[in-house]
Curated annotation (Swiss-Prot):
Top-rank taxon: Eukaryota
Name recorded for this polypeptide: Histone transcription regulator 3 homolog
Record's keyword terms, sorted: Chromosome partition, Nucleus, Transcription, Transcription regulation
Gene Ontology molecular function terms on file: nucleosome binding
Positions with biased composition (Polar residues): 389-400, 1757-1773
Family according to the record: Belongs to the HIR3 family.
GO biological process, alphabetically ordered: chromatin organization; chromosome segregation
Gene behind this protein: HIR3
Main location: nucleus
Length: 2020
């Protein structure tokens, strides 16, 4: 949640309020109607009818359709039944989340509840009032003992029940309901209502409470009376009854105890009402109670003809049982009540018949077999009954829960209400909360929400399928009907139940009622039996194609009359006679109605059981009926039936698949023969005409009997069928249908033709079934005309088709010899046929038009044959085509087979199959379909020629068939959805069953995947520009996406080895110009490989697909699309997106690119090109696109990657990652590794595509950024490694040149910024920056690249540079051109006009003598310059983002400074310049009252300019714009202006004041920050300029103290200043000048020591040193010398020390001249003589004692008193000789180094004189320090001058400490070593160490204590952080013990020899550790920016955590020292 919320924002209108308003309207309307009804109701009996009409109108209001209008009980009952709650509300309201209780207790919900409550309450009262009217008008009313519920009593109770449901807290209404319940004699309801009336909110089990209202008190009294009447003492003991038992109701109130006194109340007494009333009551109870009791008590009886037949078969031996059965039927009342037999009640009747015939004598087992279906039915019925019972119990429990009373009814405390015991809420409020809880957990809503994604996806897919089929021209209505069913099912929850397609229903049944044996048919790969000749006839059965629909046999009709008839003949009939009569009765319906399978089975079993009886009875009847037509007519139905059924039975048991034994067959054959004779005799007796149906039936059956002879002649059978056909046709016998006979279901000429065709085509099929038929051409020629006649043409010649047995062979020969594939249908539309082909086509016609009769017979036969047979034929044809490598025709055969299967699943044969057998057939067919889908899909995907001969008609038919297949298979998904969501429970069973069920589901999912893939391939082949919806490619992509969504959300798109995902990936990569392909491809890649593209509108969904490893081949295919996506996104966003991860993964898969010779060649050319000097002409040629670099083409697999810009993309990603932090705002150096990686990929891109401009541009950027990194953070490389910087600049300029040249003729897209603008701008910036400091035109200078040229005259050569160098003016001119081009593309970028104005100004200032003729003529004018400046100011001011943002100062400052310079130059009058400035946004207006308004003098203009600068400075609140400050100072102090020394001093002080206020602190710390728009490297240039200016000002002001502090700061920050060495030298010279001036030390002309010998000088030097230790501090000359020595230590040999030594020499010389003679002591010459004398004596003594070998003892005695030699130590004889020899060799006097040595010794002696603390000698001689300083080299003296210096160092080391350390340690030695010769190394090292030590000692003396040898490392902030001064006496007195606190730390970092140039920051940080610590403690008063303080705080925190700082800390300190 946000921490605050705006209070001034008005909330938007809430849609819920609109919904509530709609509800309020409904409530208001209902209340108006209620008031109208109530008004009429109150008018009494005269308005009863009007009131009733008003109430009816009231209950038609909208509020009574709301869910709230239903009672708890109704909702519970509906939920228990699984019925969704119906609401007539607007779907938009309910979908929007309608809150029924919106508005709270007093809102709409409360009004709605009140309206419902009042309506129902008064409606019930209305009927009570009608009873009251009747009681007064009807005299018989008082005689009524009770009311009837089904009269108006039901309306009263129902209305009041609904009202109490709305408000159960109305005790008065409860009393009325109880009273009315008593009127209808319901004690139970009465008691319940009274208990509800007195049930309190507070539980009486906790505390005893009185009834809160009078109504509740009366209810309690009534309940007490009722309980006493019933004698229920247990209920009376309940605590709630206590108030009524303890207290007595007054008689006054008891009169009002009965709320409805005019109604009867039979419950007042336990005596029941009258008998008539009792009967009525019983009837009422029966009506109100369960109706199932009657059915439970009635016994099961025979209720159908089939059951009667089965019963008679069982009681053939017991006649009495047969009659008892008939008697039971007579007594039964169920006749003519239809009972539907379940479709899956019994097994196939054929198998039952076969069993019945096989064992005719086993009477004991027959009843069991017969009863099996009954038992199954009984079992199923029992299951259903148990299920119903369970459902009923569930309903009862729900109802009970809805009527459940509170726990107080049982005397138990209600724990849920204990917390609310103090707060009593109304029942209505609690009721509302219960409603809310129910609505939030409504299961129907949850189910609907879960179903919605599946429904939406399905609707989209099938609607799209329908649309595509319509556009393709499909006209199959059944296809669209099936698809429409599926689409319509998306609007319901019970989706599978809405599908009516029979095959789909079968699939649903297979899944829902799963049986493992059924699934095995589909799952197991059992080899099918090969189709042979014997099975041919079985597959060629006629079937029921022509059989008309017959009415079903009513198995109860006439059953009772038959039973009554049999019962009347009980005296003479036997059981066999009853059986005969039963057969005779059922024979009446044999030819007129369709028997059920159970009935057919009963008839066949009866024929088998009583065959002999039937034969005997029929024979007797025929004999008796001879001559009597009437009696013969009685046998008209039974005789033909018996004969025909025996034919049917014999056919069944003799088919090839029958397993009936031979004996049974022979017995059946014998019976058939007998019945043939009977039928023949009967027909002769009746003597009917030839066209009589009985004659036709007999002839047909006779032919069938003849065809089943032992060795029938085929020709004879054929002739018989032909004769029969002719007879039927000639006699015009109408078609006869025998619905109960399988073998002869239809008798007609057409059926006879089918039989004939079966015989005539037998040879044809017998040939096909031969296994040795290996000639594929013969198979094709044979089968193609039969299976696919539309594609076969016959030659237009010929021969008449023959008939008879030769017709088949002739037709075969014709088709074999002349049949060809119909090219007219299969040829493509794009190719035109030649005239010859056209003429040849005219000679042909379709085989359908000239087919022989045998061929037609084949077609007829196949039309009626089984699916397996036709599939087998198509398979043989496909195999034949495959054998001749005609794959496209094999593919066509597969498609035709699929169409065949789909057609047969919709055929009548399939529909008429028995359900159980149909499911098995369906699973077998599904298995065949799956195999065909696999074969067809493999061809469609892998064979490019698969669709070559597939014409449009073929595509339409196959697409329609596949659409049906997909609809069919989708039913499996619908069933699984129901289980997944929870509509249906998961099936239970053992592990094997579950495994089989899961295998079935997986197999179906795989089939769905394959079917959808094949459907897509068909659509792809059929869709073109003429029949597409949007566009061919868009249609296909959308269709793939729709399929993916449907199978993806169901988590099975991974099925079938992810074939669909792979197909979709390949197809999406092929399709171009499609919409939303990012979403489509992104989801596919995520499913396949787990990759996310991060683009598109949709989020990828988890489809539960395990990712596969991405291969290089697949990656190469994806590169194009990934590059397109990456190029669409801004590069910064790309680095944060999922696409970046995908790109990295792809690059890992691709791996490193191997270089080829061509790539090496290109790279070598590029490298050589970048080394070339910059040719001016090449730059200008680039503007017209005429510059390129030589490269050869590269052909490798990776070339395609470069073509799509893959390597450029990788390079841009690395480059953008480096640029992620803006260069100007970065606080640490960038990760140059990313920069180099980016450059590597860009070079790789250019090796493939050398003409890619953006690659050259970005490579130039890489060089630019590398250059910026080199100069941004430190000035080291600018000062030391300039060749590397020049290389970067040249590389960048060359790359920019090529980028500019290649981009001139291209149309550049600007989706991610404007790269072309960036090219122009950055190229111009590079050119301009290279022309200015610190680069100073060096990239354009190539004097080092000279070559020899041959002279024009002569044979000599001369050396010259390659071409003329580019001057500054040309560079500025070229840059200006680029800036103008950039302005054209981005006019709102202020930097372009700003930099253009700078270029113009530089060009404007250039003298004409430096320009060529062309440049002079086109020189920049003054107005152009000023207009450009104005433009820059305008654009920059408009670019400001808001008032609270800082303005862009650079253009404002630039126009001020340039106008000032123009005024100073005299080019622009001051007034005009002031007018221009006043027009600017930040300009200062000139008022006439201003004293400078006249601008008569230069001072007026300067004052005006200074005021302008001050205004800009005020705007710059962050103090970033240091150029404004320095410009102000330079205006005050103009170096170019000649003024007097006094004025110069005043100007200098004014300028110093400006700088001191804003730029320099009191301790001379310079605070200069790098501005955002400042070019990298310029900061160091500015700091150098500012230091030089400050130095000049301090020199003029003679401010030596500030200059000394400035030098200290400058010395520590050497890496921050451009030209630091020169800057340091100039500042040092200025400081030395001030020293001489301050102490009046002039150069000494004469050598003051020329008269002294060295020995005498030593004596004098000792005296001067002693003097310096005592009285030297008071002498100015000595102070000057001391400061000079300290300065020399600070210098640390960075500058040559000669000027410092000169000052020391001059100071010491003057001290000698002025002081030495005044010092006490003997003459120096005498002292020298005494010393010589002592040495001589010592030498003599030594020589005398040589013989005694006591040299050492004598030496100790002689040297002991020589205290003056303690400095140099005890002399050895060799040293003595050397010392004696020295005076003799040096006669010239005192040398200069000796003087300097003595001067330093005197200063050291003076510094160590007071020793308040421990001696500093120990500090200097620390072993740790000595081990870390380069003093080892001191022994290697390089020259004669090193001797005295070394002596000075030794003396300093023994006698005292150095005084100052400021310069750092090792890196300072680097400077010294670079500037001086190696002979001075010893002196440099020692002086450096001394200086460093003394500086830290001074700086740490006040604020720190030396904690350890490593010193303090808490460099928490820089000098730049605070601007306060240190105490005045800070540097005067430093405790010696603190002077070396940082000594160990300073020396352990690195050695001067090994220090890298890039580690300057480390050295600077180390140098500043001591001094800055102390300064920061005191400098707490003034700050210039917030960043320093923040940095300081951060560093302090880090210091506390890390007591020892690493090198990187020093680097950070160095960065902060720059001024960040």
């Amino acid at each position: 949640m946000p921490a605050f919320q705006a209070i001034n924002l008005e909330p938007e209108d809430n849609i819920d309020e609109q919904i509530d308003t709609t509800k309020e309207i409904h409530v208001d309307e209902a209340l108006k109607r209620f008031q109208h009804a109530l008004k009429l109701h109150a008018q009494g009996p005269r308005s009863r009818e009007a009131a009733e009409a008003a109430y009816n109108e009231l209950f038609e209001s909208e509020i009574f359709k709301y869910r709230e209008a239903k009672t708890d009980y109704e909702r519970a009952e509906r939920y228990a039944d699984g019925q969704p709650e119906v609401s007539n509300l607007d779907p938009s309201l309910t979908d929007g989340g309608l809150d029924v209780d919106a508005g709270g207790a007093d809102g709409v919900a409360a009004s709605l509840a009140q309206a419902l409550y009042l309506s129902y309450k008064n409606y019930g009262q209305f009927f009570v009032d009608k009873f009251k009217d009747a009681s007064t008008s009807d005299t018989a009313w008082k005689e009524k003992a009770q009311l009837k519920y089904h009269d108006d009593g039901r309306k009263v109770l129902d209305s009041w029940m609904t009202a109490l449901d709305q408000d159960p807290s109305d005790p008065e209404l409860w009393r009325k309901a109880a009273r009315f319940a008593g009127a209808i004699n319901s004690n139970r309801i009465k008691r319940y209502c009274l208990e509800a009336a007195i049930e309190l909110d507070d539980d009486p089990a906790v505390m005893e409470l009185d009834p809160p209202s009078l109504a509740e008190g009366m209810a309690g009294e009534q309940l007490k009376d009722q309980l006493k009447l019933l004698g229920d003492d247990m209920a009376l003991s309940h605590p709630i009854m206590a108030p009524w038992l303890k207290k007595k109701m007054p008689a006054l109130l008891k009169r009002h105890l009965d709320p409805i006194p005019f109604l009867p109340d039979p419950t007042k007494s336990l005596i029941p009402p009258k008998v008539s009333d009792t009967q009525a009551q019983t009837q009422e109870d029966t009506e109100m109670g369960d109706a199932d009791n009657a059915s439970l008590t009635e016994p099961k009886s025979v209720s159908s003809w089939a059951e009667l037949g089965a019963k008679l078969i069982n009681c053939l031996e017991t006649t009495a049982e047969a009659f008892d059965t008939c008697d039971g039927i007579v007594e039964s009342s169920l006749e003519d009540v239809p009972i539907e037999t379940p479709p899956n009640e019994i097994e196939s009747v054929a198998s039952e018949i076969e069993v019945a015939v096989t064992k005719p004598t086993e009477t004991e087992k027959s009843p069991e077999k017969d009863s099996t279906p009954k038992e199954q039915k009984a079992g199923s019925e029992g299951t259903e009954d148990s299920q119903k019972t369970a459902d009923q119990s569930q309903k009862d429990s729900n109802g009970a829960s809805a009527r459940k009373r509170s726990q107080s009814a049982a005397g138990l405390p209600d724990g849920a209400e204990e917390e609310n015991a103090m707060e009593k809420r109304s029942k209505r409020v609690r009721r509302r909360e219960t409603l809310q809880a129910e609505e939030t957990t409504d299961p129907n809503t949850l189910i609907a929400n879960q179903l919605q994604p599946y429904q939406g996806a399905d609707q989209n897919l099938f609607q799209m399928t329908k649309s595509v089929l319509e556009h393709l021209g499909v006209e199959d209505k059944s296809t669209f009907a099936f698809i429409t069913e599926l689409i319509d099912s998306c609007a319901t929850e019970n989706r599978p139940g809405k599908i009516t397609n029979l095959a789909a229903c079968d699939l649903s049944s297979v899944i829902v009622n799963f049986r493992e044996e059924v699934a095995k048919v589909f799952l197991h790969k059992n080899e099918q039996a090969s189709l042979g000749p014997s099975s041919f006839l079985e597959h060629a059965k006629t079937g029921s194609q022509d059989q008309p629909s017959m009415p079903s046999f009513n198995e109860k009709q006439g059953l009772r009359s038959f039973a009554r008839k049999i019962g009347g003949c009980r005296s003479w009939m036997t059981a066999e006679d009853v059986a005969y009569e039963w057969v005779r009765a059922v024979s009446q319906s044999y030819a007129t109605a369709k028997w059920s399978d159970k009935m057919k089975l009963s008839v066949v079993q009866m024929l088998n059981k009583v065959d002999s009886t039937l034969y005997r009875k029929i024979t007797e009847e025929m004999e008796l009926a001879a001559g009597s037509a009437e009696r013969l007519a009685d046998l008209e139905t039974i005789v033909p039936m018996l004969f025909e059924l025996h034919v049917d039975i014999y056919e069944l048991i003799t088919n090839p698949s029958s397993v009936v034994d031979y004996a049974t067959r022979m017995d059946t054959k014998y019976r058939l023969g007998r019945w043939l004779d009977i039928a023949s005799a009967y027909l002769r007796l009746i003597d009917r005409p030839a066209n009589d149906p009985l004659i036709a039936r007999f002839l047909w059956a006779s032919v069938l009997v003849s065809s089943h002879a032992e060795q029938p002649l085929r020709e004879h059978i054929l002739l018989m069928w032909t004769s029969l056909r002719d007879h039927l046709a000639d006699e015009k016998v109408p078609a006869i249908s025998l619905p109960n006979n399988v073998v002869m279901p239809t008798i007609s000429p057409a059926a006879a033709d089918r039989e004939i065709s079966k015989l005539t085509t037998m040879d044809f099929f017998l040939g096909l079934f031969q296994d040795n038929m290996d000639d594929p051409v013969f198979v094709i020629d044979t089968l193609e005309p039969v299976l696919n006649p539309s594609t076969v043409c016959a030659p237009n010649q010929g021969t008449d088709s023959e008939s008879g047995e030769d017709s088949d062979s002739s037709a075969s020969s014709d088709t074999t010899g002349a049949s060809t594939l119909d090219s007219s249908d299969d040829s493509t539309d794009d190719n035109d046929e030649s005239s010859d082909a056209s003429s040849n086509q005219k000679q042909k016609k379709s085989i359908s038009d000239c087919a022989s009769q045998s061929l037609k017979d084949l077609w007829k036969f196949l039309h009626n044959s089984s699916t397996e047979l036709r599939l087998f034929l198509w398979s043989r044809l496909g195999d034949a085509y495959d054998a001749i490598n005609y794959s496209t025709k094999k593919f066509s055969c597969c498609l035709k087979s699929i169409e065949l299967i789909v057609s047969d699943l919709e055929g009548e044969t399939y529909a008429n199959t028995v359900p159980e057998s149909r499911r098995l057939l369906f699973m077998r067919t599904l298995k065949s379909l799956d195999e065909l889908l696999i074969t067809a899909l493999g061809s469609a995907l892998n064979d490019n020629t698969a669709f070559e001969i597939i014409d449009d008609a073929h595509i339409r038919s196959t697409s329609a068939a596949l659409a049906k297949v997909n609809c069919l298979l989708h039913v499996a998904s619908l069933c699984e959805d129901e289980v997944r969501i929870g509509i249906k429970p998961e099936r239970t069973g053992n592990a094997a069953s579950k495994a089989a069920f899961q295998a079935l589901k997986n197999k179906l999912k795989e089939m769905q995947i394959r079917a959808w893939c094949l459907q897509y391939t068909m659509f792809k082949a059929g869709i073109n520009k003429d029949n597409c919806i949007i566009g061919p490619e868009n249609d296909l992509a959308d269709y793939l996406a729709a399929i993916h969504q449907v199978i993806g959300i169901r988590k099975f798109c991974k099925a079938s080895n992810k074939i669909f995902l792979k197909v979709m990936r390949v197809e999406l990569l092929k399709l171009k110009n499609i919409e939303n392909w990012e979403d489509y491809l992104g989801q596919v890649l995520y499913d396949l490989h787990g990759l996310k593209l991060g683009a598109g509108v949709w989020e990828v969904q988890d489809h539960a697909c395990p990712p596969e490893k991405l291969e290089k081949r697949q990656t190469m295919q994806l590169v194009e699309r990934v590059c397109i996506l990456a190029n669409r996104m801004p590069m910064k966003d790309l680095l944060k997106s999922d696409l970046k991860t995908t790109i990295d993964h792809m690059q890992q898969t691709i791996g490193q690119t191997k270089s080829t010779p061509q790539m090496y060649h290109n790279l070598r050319n590029f490298t050589e090109y970048l080394k070339k000097p910059i040719h001016p002409l090449r730059l200008y040629r680039a503007l017209i696109g005429d510059v390129s670099v030589d490269a050869v083409s590269v052909n490798t697999p990776e070339t395609i990657l470069a073509t799509h810009g893959w390597f450029f993309l990788l390079g841009m990603m690395a480059l953008t990652k480096f640029k992620g932090v803006e260069l100007n705002r970065r606080q640490t150096p960038g990760a140059t590794d990313d920069l180099r990686i980016g450059a590597t990929f860009l070079r790789l891109q250019l090796q493939f595509t050398a003409d890619r401009w953006d690659a050259w541009f970005r490579l130039a950027e890489c060089f630019d950024y590398e250059l910026d990194e080199a100069v941004l953070w430190t000035a080291d490389k600018m000062n030391k490694e300039r060749p590397e910087l020049v290389k970067f600049q040249r590389n960048a300029i060359h790359c920019y040149t090529l980028a500019l040249s290649h981009s001139r003729n291209l149309d550049i897209e600007t989706h991610d910024g404007d790269p072309l603008h960036d090219l122009y701008h950055k190229f111009a910036m590079r050119m301009y920056a290279s022309s200015r400091e610190p680069f100073a035109m060096e990239p354009f200078q190539h004097s080092d690249q000279e070559r020899y040229f041959i002279e024009d005259m002569g044979i000599g050569t001369f050396k010259r540079i390659l071409h003329s160098q580019m001057n500054k003016y040309k560079v500025w001119k070229f840059a200006a051109k680029l800036f103008r081009m950039a302005m054209d593309r981005k006019p709102d970028n202020w930097k372009n006009p700003y930099m253009l104005s700078k270029c113009y100004w530089k060009m404007y200032q250039t003298p004409d003598d430096q320009l060529d003729v062309k440049d002079i003529t086109s020189k920049i004018g003054l107005m152009t310059l000023i207009d450009t400046l104005k433009k820059a100011v305008e654009v920059a001011h408009n670019a400001r983002r808001g008032r609270n943002t800082d303005p862009i100062f650079e253009p404002h400052y630039k126009i001020v400074t340039i106008l000032h310079k123009l005024v100073i130059r005299g080019d622009v009058p001051a007034k005009d310049a002031a007018e221009i400035l006043s027009e600017q946004p930040f300009g200062l207006e000139v008022n006439p009252d201003d004293h400078f308004a006249s601008f008569s003098a230069l001072e007026d203009w300067e004052e005006y300019i200074i005021r302008n600068l001050s205004k800009l400075k005020e705007k710059d609140k962050a103090n970033w714009q240091h150029r404004i400050i320095i410009r102000h100072a330079k205006i005050l102090f103009d170096e170019a202006t000649e003024v007097s020394s006094e004025d110069r001093l005043v100007n200098a002080k004014a300028a110093f004041g400006v700088l001191r206020d804003s730029m320099f602190t009191k301790t001379m710390v310079m605070n200069v920050w790098k501005c955002d728009a400042e070019r990298p490297g310029r900061h160091h240039v500015y700091t150098e300029q500012y230091v030089r200016l400050m130095t000049k000002l301090l020199v003029i002001m003679n401010d030596r103290g500030n200059l000394e502090q400035l030098l200290r700061r400058l010395r520590k920050k050497g890496a921050d200043f451009y030209h630091f060495t020169d800057l340091w030298q100039s500042c040092c010279m200025a400081y030395l000048k001030l020293l001489r001036q301050g102490y009046n030390v002039s150069p000494v002309a004469d050598d003051a020591f020329k008269a002294l010998s060295s020995e005498e000088f030593e004596v004098v030097g000792e005296r001067i040193a002693d003097w310096a230790a005592s009285d030297g501090a008071e002498n100015p000359l000595f102070n000057c010398m001391k400061e000079a020595i300290e300065f020399k230590k600070l210098n640390a040999n960075l500058m040559k020390v000669a000027p410092i030594d000169d000052l020391l020499y001059d100071c010491y010389s003057r001290i000698y001249s002025e002081i030495a003679k005044t010092l006490p002591g003997p003459d120096p010459s005498k002292v020298v003589e005494e010393r010589h004398h002592a040495k001589e004596v010592a030498a003599q003594l030594e020589a005398a004692q040589t013989e005694t070998k006591v040299t050492s003892s004598l030496a100790s005695i002689l040297n002991a008193p020589n205290g003056q030699e303690s400095i140099t130590g005890t002399a050895t004889p060799m040293e003595t000789e050397k010392q004696e020899a020295a005076p003799r060799s040096r006669k010239t006097g005192v040398r200069r180094p000796d003087v300097l040595r003595k001067a330093e010794q005197a200063v050291i002696r003076a510094l160590e004189a007071p020793k308040p603390n421990k001696s500093r000698v120990g500090s200097v001689s620390s072993g740790k320090r000595g081990s870390r300083t380069p003093n080892q080299r001191a022994s290697d003296a390089g020259s004669e001058e090193d001797g005295p210096d070394s002596q000075i160092r030794r003396e300093a080391g023994h006698d005292g400490d150095v005084d100052m350390k400021d310069a750092g340690d090792e890196n300072e030695e680097d400077h010294g070593e670079e500037e001086h010769d190696e002979e001075n190394e010893d002196e440099q090292d020692e002086e450096h160490d001394e200086a460093a030590e003394d500086e830290n000692a001074e700086e740490h003396g006040v604020e720190e204590k030396a904690d350890s040898e490593t010193g303090s490392i808490e460099d928490s902030a820089d000098d730049e952080s605070d601007l306060s001064d240190v105490p005045e006496d800070y540097d005067e007195e430093v405790p010696p013990g603190l002077r070396f606190s940082n000594l160990g730390h300073q020396s352990e970092e690195s050695s001067g020899e090994d220090a890298d140039s890039e580690s300057e920051g480390d050295d600077e940080a180390e140098e500043s550790d001591g001094e800055e610590e102390a300064e920061e403690e005191a400098e707490g008063e003034e700050t210039l920016g917030i960043e320093d303080t923040e940095l300081a705080d951060e560093d302090e925190d880090e210091d506390e955590e890390q007591p020892k700082r690493s090198g990187s800390w020093a680097a950070n300190d160095s960065i902060r020292a720059v001024g960040w």
